[in-house]
Amino acid sequence: PPRSTLFPYTTLFRSLIARVPARQVVLEGQTSWIPVPEGKGADDRVHTAFILDMSAPGVQVRQRCQFEGCRGIENAHLTMQQVRVPVENVIGEVGKGLKYALTILNVGRGISIPAICLGMAKQAWQPTLDRANGRVTFHKPLAERQTQQIRLGDMAGHLFAMEALSMLVWRLADQHRHDIRIEAAVAKIFCSEHTIRFLRDAQILFGGMGYETAASKMARGEAAFGIEQLVRDAEMYRIGEGATDILRPFIVREGLSHHLDRAKPLYSGELSILDQLKQLVKLGGFYLPWYMRHWLRQPLPDDSALAHPQVSPVLRYVERTSRRLARETFYAMVRFQAAFQDEQRVQNRIESIGEDLLALVATLLYAEQQTRLEGRTTVWELAEAFDVAARQRISRRLHELRHHRDGITGTTGLQALKGYYPGLSSGIVHRRLDDYRRQAAVSEAIPMAMASLSVPMKDQGRLNLP
């Protein structure tokens, strides 16, 4: 079909689930945001990607979805009734749709989202500096206040780290020799989370004008920089291509998959006592030397960049902390055993520590490269600012791996889900989530009732409608 009839509201149907007979696919169901139908003939064992002609009979766009930010997103609520898709519209091989989708996700996570986030942060950087230098409060520019100097220094260090980590992952992707699933996910989390924080800090420096839209400021001749739009847009990149809360456990499980597979027979519950003892001896034979090795300092690779006097001390810290993280992870696996798969209190901290360690390595090597190739010696100040912040986070999270109070807050959250704290909703007009659906239905019904009554517009306000 002509290009104009393809995807007017969606960019790609990546993993529609359907059986593919000899000549055509029949689709039935409805979708929102990511099109995955539930209908006759659907088989969750066969994920096949194909192009859907949006002008095909039975395809109907019910609604163009609207979002907090990124107003140009072409996502929609679609319905499909007996839609027939020619088999020549299948992309690649039948049953390989999920594989294609996950491959595309690596590109989005590791390349697209870090690039977008980095661009947004860079776009906000110079206007934020100009605001800090130009805004005077109580006869003193914001730039002369320690609170704002610390805030801007932290922003600068993390902006440099985002660029360094992104460049590292992009180089790995360009080589086409590496499985970058973990690195892509880490880059996505790091850049999206720190961009949100970066932009919110910038908005704080703009004060009330940071909450005002660019169009409103332009109307009276102010500098029409839309920091509020960047803040709204950035939230999407925390969610898109894998939400942070999903990716953190994913990274840990991917990174530890060979350890989890090694211990799986022991926790399966299918072994006799004798077989369990044999399995323990086998695991001990592997993990005893592994554990002892992680107490011993490992030499850094022989490379001039790693031997740089400002790089090597940080890399030794990363090497030392990586061994400690490996030991702490081993303790956690022994402590929680089979339950470790769902122990997100520990998994999230393990991922966060590893994320900062990878970003530290990328930042120091990027600073060395910038100095060697471009003579930019000021980058060491940026690297040091990030180093300070990252080490503080790492130290805190290492401590929390064994000493945290998440059990208390987790129990409170569970009790809240069971309805134990009704007083938290007191003092307002109480509504449940479904009440807003009914409210929307009433709002749609009122204009139709007005039209059916044929009441002049000037008199509609006098009607006493229920």
Annotate each language-model stretch with its function:
Residues 1-12:
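Short, small-residue-biased leader/transition segments that mark boundaries at the very start
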Residues 13, 101, 114-128, 132-227, ...:
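Extended, hydrophobic alpha-helical segments in both membrane/secreted and soluble proteins
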Residues 13-61:
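A short core secondary-structure module
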Residues 60-159, 235-240, 253-256, 268-355:
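Glycine-rich beta->alpha junctions and the first turn(s) of the following alpha-helix
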Residues 119, 150-156, 160, 185, ...:
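Generic structural signal for well-ordered, non-transmembrane alpha-helical segments
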Residues 159-192, 203-213, 337, 359-391, ...:
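C-terminal helix-coil-helix/basic helical segment that borders enzyme active sites and/or dimer interfaces
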Residues 209-307, 406-466:
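Glycine-rich phosphate/cofactor-binding loops in nucleotide/flavin-utilizing enzymes
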Residues 243-260, 347-365, 371-374, 379:
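C-terminal catalytic subdomain
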